[in-house]
């Protein structure tokens, strides 16, 4: 199952899928899935920082509001701190409420952050499972998933029949499915 489109569509689709659907999305987009995750992270980070800047600029413009500070402000430190908090949230799925304080649609950002964190965790597990396959199985699967080669092409290179490669791929997928589904199901519990 290929997912083409914007990250919001991918995030929404991934979040709403069951374990089987999530596995299908990861396998169908295996070669580009890390890029999908990185792009989604960058967009979320950009949107949150833009919202924060909007809130800061509007709070300064309000008349009648006097904010007294110590006079020491370090915008570079503040931005670095915000970046670290957002990056940590995207990796762990745990959101410091301070980074979303006052932001409109904070709940949407929370869901997106948790989804991206789950996507990363799920994909890292899938990569580990694929790496742990026998060398030959891993090679054949990567030719299909990463290089986009057809079963016929793989069969020709391996000196085997199309049917033999097809059956082997079915066996490999079943092995991956068996290993990963329990974990994906646990991750789906809080993902909807």
Predicted feature locations:
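Short, locally clustered residues in the helix-turn-helix/winged-helix DNA-binding domain
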Residues: 131, 145-146
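N-terminal interaction/assembly modules
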Residues: 1-129, 182-191
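A short pre-motif secondary-structure segment
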Residues: 140-141
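Helix-turn-helix DNA-binding module
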Residues: 147-164
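C-terminal flanking helix
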Residues: 173-184
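Alpha-helical hinge/cap motifs
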Residues: 133-134, 159
């Amino acid at each position: 199952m290929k997912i083409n489109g914007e990250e919001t569509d991918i995030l929404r689709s991934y979040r709403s899928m069951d374990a089987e659907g999530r596995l299908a999305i990861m396998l169908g987009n295996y070669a580009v899935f890390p890029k999908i995750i990185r792009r989604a992270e960058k967009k979320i980070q950009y949107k949150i920082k833009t919202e924060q800047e909007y809130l800061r600029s509007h709070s300064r413009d309000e008349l009648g509001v006097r904010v007294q500070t110590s006079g020491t402000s370090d915008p570079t430190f503040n931005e670095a701190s915000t970046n670290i908090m957002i990056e940590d949230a995207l990796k762990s799925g745990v959101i410091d409420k301070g980074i979303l304080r006052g932001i409109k649609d904070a709940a949407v950002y929370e869901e997106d952050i948790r989804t991206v964190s789950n996507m990363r965790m799920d994909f890292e597990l899938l990569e580990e499972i694929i790496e742990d396959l026998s060398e030959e199985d891993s090679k054949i699967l990567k030719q299909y998933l990463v290089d986009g080669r057809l079963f016929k092409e793989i069969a020709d290179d391996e000196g085997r029949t199309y049917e033999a490669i097809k059956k082997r791929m079915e066996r490999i997928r079943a092995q991956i499915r068996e290993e990963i589904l329990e974990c994906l199901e646990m991750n789906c519990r809080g993902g909807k």
